[in-house]
Amino acid sequence: MKLSPPKKNLPPQKNNEPPFPYLRLLVQVGIALFLVWIWQESLHKATVSTIPYSEFLNKINQKEIIECKITPDEIYGKMLVSKPEEKGQPPKIALFSTVRVDDPDLVKRLQSAGVVYGSVKPSLLSQILFSWVVPILIFFLVWFALARFMGGGGAGYSLLNIGKSRARLLVDESTGVTFADVAGCDEAKYELQEVVDFLKNPSRYRALGAKIPKGVLLVGPPGTGKTLLAKAVAGEAKVPFFSISGSEFVEMFVGVGAARVRDLFGQAKSKAPCIVFIDELDAIGRQRGVRIQVGSDEHEQTLNQLLVEMDGFDPNEGIIVLAATNRPEILDRALLRPGRFDRQVVVDLPDANGREAILRVHARGKPLSENIDFKEIAQATMGFSGADLANLLNEAALLAARRKSSRIEQVDLLEAMEKVIAGPERKSRVLSEKERERVAYHEVGHALVAFYSEHAEPVRKISIVPRGKSALGYTLQLPTAQKYLLSKSELLDRICVAMGGRAAEELIYGDITTGAENDLEVATTIARQMVCLYGMGEKSGLAHYVPPQPLLGGLDTSYLKECSDETARIIDLEIEKILEENYQRALSILRHHHVELKEVTKYLLQKETLNAEEFKSILENLKEQRKEAPSYSSTL
């Protein structure tokens, strides 16, 4: 079977056209007429006085009934309200209605009183209107409203096409993305090159009896470029690209998701060779049988249909299914077996080189200054995803526009990086002089402990400008190189640096504040990881006391207890010991360098922000002064 290339000019898609072009207009006209009729009826009833039948008989005897009409259900007409006060004036007449009672003498009473009366028989048209048309119209309006509600806001979605797939079809001209637009994930691109080559040259693989994976699962934290990679595969292979989110399959009605899966693969077969991309696969691919909630049947039917479609279509049809998720651990095992999503491509956070390449990709089309150093930014943004870096460049462009500059400068990138890391400046948050001084000592305490610790990361900036929601100041440390392993000494130094702010407060004021809350949280987390994960405790041994944490994007610190009570007590004592020892070490460092602590704090209070060069310059000047004065003492 030979695969024919897709046509360049695909016919326009009509999935979104409403089934009846004038349906909305007809419904609106019907509603308007119905409301006008109700309004007229309400006005008529407002002018009619309803009286009891006994009063109606009394008015007949008093000859106050002028005329009346008799229907099967009621009697209505005109009655005299009051006689004219003067001659020549007309009498006051009002409309009335009363319930008809089975009274054989009614006609005689009307004749004797001289009342003009008659009988009214309801027309066949009104009977049909009230018996059939109005109920059908109300039912149709409810049905139409429900159909629009279930449509999810898209034009043309209704109960008539609720089982249609909502996949968006892009052809090679409209994807606009190739592998040149993707950076920072070279290994993932290499894995997907095979898929592209198969779509371009399928005969070479079939001649060797090779089978391309039916499904490729892109796994990685949010923002790492999984969707962009899928578009790049379609752009490189120049084949139609169906894109849909997993949440778009599932609706309120059971069976809709399965119908949409069938419709999606039906469209894909008609456009083969092509790529079907399902974003957020975990929305429909969760493990079956573990949820007890409303809607479980719909999720499971949708998943079952997806399993059937992936294992049922002919492998020579040229349909490649790409999917993305950041929670592979909750996917059903049947999805990951050979024959379905049998290949997993990890799209991890980029390293320093990858971040630099991503920055260069996102900087295309932006006016940049000649002094831009992407390498410096890349080294300083460890842990940033591709989306974070794109946001960083956008923030830099906004800052440059705010300065009314025609180009993006390095200072804009650095300020944008700080804004992303620590939050925007809170210029409206005004601190008292005492609080400002305490914050300065706190931040300088962090910086000095980091500077005099052998394995701590270098200090890049110290600031007492409030940022974000709660930060009154911050000390920015940036690594000099990408690290994949951390030694025990490095971890202990990180704890010691975190304790530096609290130690400085106690040393200067003899009192402590709530400002070290986040520092204590960070230090405790590192200490717990050392004891429970890395076997670095003295008495806890080499056992691993924490269950696996499969969620991507970092370790979950809500540890589950998987040890005896005695072992848990030992772990708590080990953690407490590590924290206390490093707190005392931070105190010792600051006592030995208390002059530096006061001098740097004095400069920080004057300038509010010190960069790495200024910080080092102050310390070097103090060091020179110490050499020139032999009696210089730095002990507290």
Swiss-Prot record:
Alphabetical GO biological process terms: protein catabolic process; proteolysis
Lipid bilayer topology: Multi-pass membrane protein
Native source species: Methylacidiphilum infernorum (isolate V4) (Methylokorus infernorum (strain V4))
Enzyme class: hydrolase
Transmembrane regions: 19-39, 127-147
Cofactor(s) it depends on: Zn(2+)
Topological domain spans for side Cytoplasmic: 1-18, 148-636
Entry's localization field: Cell inner membrane
Highest taxon of the lineage: Bacteria
Key word Cytoplasm present: no
CDD domains assigned to the protein according to its UniProt record, in alphabetical order: RecA-like_FtsH
Taxonomic path: Bacteria, Pseudomonadati, Verrucomicrobiota, Methylacidiphilae, Methylacidiphilales
UniProt keywords, alphabetically: ATP-binding, Cell inner membrane, Cell membrane, Hydrolase, Membrane, Metal-binding, Metalloprotease, Nucleotide-binding, Protease, Transmembrane, Transmembrane helix, Zinc
Periplasmic face of the membrane: 40-126
Catalytic residues (positions): 443
Stored NCBIfam families: FtsH_fam
Protein name: ATP-dependent zinc metalloprotease FtsH 1
Binding site for ATP: 220-227
Chain positions recorded as Zn(2+) binding sites: 442, 446, 519
GO molecular-function terms, A-Z: ATP binding; ATP hydrolysis activity; ATP-dependent peptidase activity; metalloendopeptidase activity; zinc ion binding
Family: In the central section; belongs to the AAA ATPase family. In the C-terminal section; belongs to the peptidase M41 family.
Gene3D superfamilies: 1.10.8.60, 3.30.720.210, P-loop containing nucleotide triphosphate hydrolases (3.40.50.300), Peptidase M41 (1.20.58.760)
Subunit structure: Homohexamer.
Cofactor: binding comment: Binds 1 zinc ion per subunit.
Function: Acts as a processive, ATP-dependent zinc metallopeptidase for both cytoplasmic and membrane proteins. Plays a role in the quality control of integral membrane proteins.
EC number: 3.4.24.-
Coiled coil: none
